[in-house]
Design a protein with these regions (language model features):
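Bacterial N-terminal signal peptides
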Residues: 2-12
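An active-site-proximal "capping" alpha-helix that borders the catalytic cofactor pocket
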Residues: 150-169
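Active-site/pore-lining binding-face segments in mid-to-C-terminal subdomains
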Residues: 166-216
Length: 280
């Protein structure tokens, strides 16, 4: 996961060029492209992603997956920040989404507070883009492996993304979770659309914190309710009490439906040994 997170720092350094990952580690069934945007203002975001080899590093991250068919992932102009994944279509990282994340992030050198956590621009950039890519890849995998999903597929994909983020290093988990939480919290004022297939951003915020807190109660303790009544950003104690049970169910389903039948363990162990933030 850290390779993807480190790659996504592209949005903060437009002229930086990262080291290209070795071709031998890539998943050959993951095809990528950076489509030229029609809008001139979005060209810089394409360049940033290309300079950091973001999609090439996603190919490496997905290398342990034994895919049954081709998975196309592309960066493109969409007209909107996010295009919902549909069966058989490419996974798309929209330049408009990268631009929105960039605009909502703290300025360079600025540190902001989210509850008891301090948040840097780096974390605010890495988190939501990593989460979105993992979410949409999860949707594609649901279809590819014909996995049964009880309830909303969007909620299930959020859970897979969150579970993935918290199951690598503590540093990676912190950056991606806190950054995603910041981005979701910034959208709380969006009107509730009860016809939307995605949960409201406030629900997604607390679902993410629930997974994170259950995975590491020490690292994410600062998001837990501190006083007699929870503040707006805090995970209520009543909800936290159910998080461990929910996480156990999530872990069991992930292992039985994705990891055990579809992941190449030697490749996975090789992936985990890499020091992503330094190596790439």
């Amino acid at each position: 996961m850290g390779v993807l997170a480190s790659a996504l720092l592209a949005v903060q350094a437009p002229v930086a060029v990262a080291q290209k990952p070795p071709d031998g580690l890539k998943n050959p069934l993951v095809e990528i492209s950076y489509e030229p945007p029609r809008t001139a203002a979005l060209a810089e975001f394409r360049a940033r992603l290309q300079n950091r080899y973001v999609l090439e590093k996603l190919q490496v991250f997905l290398s342990p997956l034994n895919l049954t068919e081709r998975l196309v992932v592309k960066a493109d102009e969409c007209g909107v920040p996010h295009v919902l994944y549909t069966r058989g279509a490419p996974v798309v990282l929209c330049y408009e989404y990268v631009a929105k994340v960039d605009a909502d992030a703290p300025r360079i050198g600025q540190v902001v507070q989210l509850g008891q956590a301090e948040l840097t621009r780096e974390e605010a950039l890495v988190g939501p883009i990593t989460q979105l890519v993992l979410h949409d890849v999860a949707r594609a995998i649901f279809h590819m492996y014909k996995l049964p999903v009880w309830g909303g597929a969007e909620f299930a994909a959020d859970n897979v993304a969150a579970y993935t983020m918290v199951n690598f290093s503590q540093k990676t988990a912190w950056k991606t979770v806190v950054g995603t939480a910041w981005f979701l919290k910034s959208g709380w004022d969006r009107p509730v659309d009860i016809s939307d297939i995605r949960p409201h951003v406030a629900q997604r915020y607390f679902a993410l914190l629930c997974v994170a807190y259950a995975a590491d109660q020490v690292q994410f303790e600062g998001f837990l309710q501190q006083g007699p009544k929870p503040k707006v950003y805090e995970l209520p104690v009543e909800r936290a009490n159910t998080c461990l049970y929910d996480y156990e169910k999530l872990s069991t389903s992930f292992m039985k439906t994705i990891f055990e039948p579809h992941v190449d363990r030697p490749k996975f162990e090789q992936l985990r040994k890499l020091e992503w933030l330094k190596d790439f």
